[in-house]
Amino acid sequence: MEKNKVFAVIDTNVIVSALLSRNNKESNTSRVFEAILDGRITPLYNEEILDEYKEVLGRSKFPFYKEDVEMVEILMVTVGLKLGRTTSFEGVFPDPKDVVFYEVRLSKDDAYLVMGNIKHFPQKPFVVTPAEMVSILGL
């Protein structure tokens, strides 16, 4: 049986958690990241999302090497789909930097938004946690 394949915007906190737990292959964030690597998830992004990844992953509080940050960017650009932002969303988020993730997801109807903390986002079926994405993928 072929595993499900999906499009998804991956929030920065999911990437951070996946890299921090990369030695724990059973963590849901690691499984989501692995699904990107093996082609089951096609990540959606734009330049603002890439900039957010680089800025957050480059913070001194994280034990990431420059190569880790570059690898994430190369991965997204190589296997991902670059999209624009929709302008149809007029909601409010506690963190204004989160809006771009939601708007890029709104640019592709059949996509998901994978978030570690979904409580600050509109309750929509396409806004999912890493655990929910693992289930959607049938992992």
Predicted regions mapped to residue ranges:
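Short, well-structured N-terminal submotif of metal-dependent ribonuclease cores
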Residues: 1-43
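Short secondary-structure boundary segments
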Residues: 12, 47, 116-118
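Active-site neighborhoods of divalent-metal-dependent phosphate/nucleic-acid chemistry enzymes
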Residues: 77-113
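Residues that scaffold the ATP/ADP-binding catalytic core of kinase and kinase-like folds
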Residues: 17-19, 56, 124, 136-137
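PIN-domain endoribonuclease scaffold, especially VapC-family toxins
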Residues: 33-88
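Short, active-site-adjacent cap segments at secondary-structure transitions
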Residues: 15-16, 51, 120-122
